[in-house]
Amino acid sequence: MTTTVATKDRILRAAEELFARRGFDGSSLRELTSAAGVNLAAVSYHFGCKEKLIEKVLRRRLDQLNTQRMAALDHVEGRPDTTLEQVLDAYIRPALEISYDVGGECFMRMLARAFAERDERLRELLSQNYGHVMRRFAAEFARLLPHLDKVELYWRMDLVTGALTLAMSGFGMIQRAENVSEQAHHEQTTQHLIRFAAAGLGQGGLARHTRQ
């Protein structure tokens, strides 16, 4: 790793940790340069400004996540024998695996904080750069669940994503048992979430009620 690449990576890791603790708006470049052991000129050279740095921190893992999701979806998309569980596996497993990576927990805390604070930068980034990924999954879910209209499908996808976000945070009620390996616990989490999501997505459409 060259000195330039090492410096850039050090800034990104320090920024991720700082944003997880303080949020995007609560973090200053002075704090960042101190944590990364660099000067302000290095941050400006590699990223230009704080907004660009935030984007790079987010995209560093989100690009990887969505590349893996699309690769997994490629294997099952459009096939007559594809099951709902297989498509959910392509959506869920890559996200959980990234959350288990080194630094993944910190990234998830940063992401959860941004969601909780309703950060519009995150919403815009997801829409502009990863909207096509969600549309591909939505199209495949729609193919497998023709009884759902578009609005109902998107509601259910949104709730599945919420459950996935909780699982990625590792902050749920279910903790790893002492006699279960970490790898086995991760697989249990994946399988339980896929079954839960399949039940929620696949059930019949809701009855339409009219007010009297």
Predicted features and spans:
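Helix-turn-helix
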Residues: 10, 18-52, 56-60
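Short alpha-helical scaffolding segments that buttress acidic/His motifs in well-ordered protein cores
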Residues: 91, 95, 108-115, 160, ...
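An amphipathic alpha-helix adjacent to DNA-recognition modules
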Residues: 8-13, 47-70, 74-77, 81, ...
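Amphipathic alpha-helical segments used for helix-helix packing
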Residues: 86-88, 99-128, 171-173
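N-terminal intrinsically disordered/low-complexity leader segments
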Residues: 1-6, 77, 207-212
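C-terminal peripheral helix-coil segments that are non-catalytic and often amphipathic
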Residues: 128-212
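Hydrophobic alpha-helical connector segments
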Residues: 71-105, 157
